[in-house]
Amino acid sequence: MQIGDLSKRTGISVRMLRYYEQEGLLAPARRASGYRDYGEAEERTVRRIRLLSEAGLKLDTIRFLLPCVLTDRPDFEPCAEVLATLRHEVAGLDEKIDCLQSSRDILTGYLERLG
């Protein structure tokens, strides 16, 4: 399938799909005409990238974890350092949540004072 078709099937923009390729996350075959040819494997990869991205992971972490992701759900094959990486990411998310909660508390306090 062509990149536009993959975009429609996955909900990921053409621009982002090209970025994934540039970053080495996708490696579609090339037709004789030079057009990219995406198959079912690339579609599964894009869905896995999306899953990890929606979990709040950065691209470098996704690149590291992608070979360990078995399905479009959070199922992992035991790859080296996966636990440490996931724990680090969870700690980072906890830190962001704490920061957001503090910001929310400040804004809520302002609203209460303003009536």
Summary of predicted features, one role per range:
Residues 6, 13-16:
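Short glycine/proline-centered loop/turn elements that form peptide/ligand docking sites
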Residues 2-8, 40-115:
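Arg/Lys-rich, alpha-helical DNA-contact motif
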